[in-house]
């Protein structure tokens, strides 16, 4: 099934908007994580970690999931397909890794935010706080991969893609 051009472009704009918003919020999360590690003043720590908690739960996770769902819908309703091209499969895998890692990080983010909000010392939570920098930076790099693949669209069909192309050629009499 091929989408009407107006619907296809609307989905594309929504997908790109979610993806760009997600990258921006991950960048903000990373900056706050760096500020949180370097700060000693309780107000800065509280502001940084409470903001990180809200960014992760209320912006990053919904944007990641929206981008993933919209991307899957777009590929299923277009000639590109979901499993025909390697670059789309890599985008899909990257788009699944990010929310999984984020969901695994959320309890730690909540814990540090709650400790900062209550004014408890965060010295014993240095491991999770460093993890926010590592995972935030890694997440940003992983999010760059789908963006680059979307722009360059490298050649290369999957086995499924080759089989589909062969079947289409055979059906059309080529």
Residue map of PLM features:
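Polytopic transmembrane helical bundles with strong interfacial aromatic enrichment
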Residues: 1-174
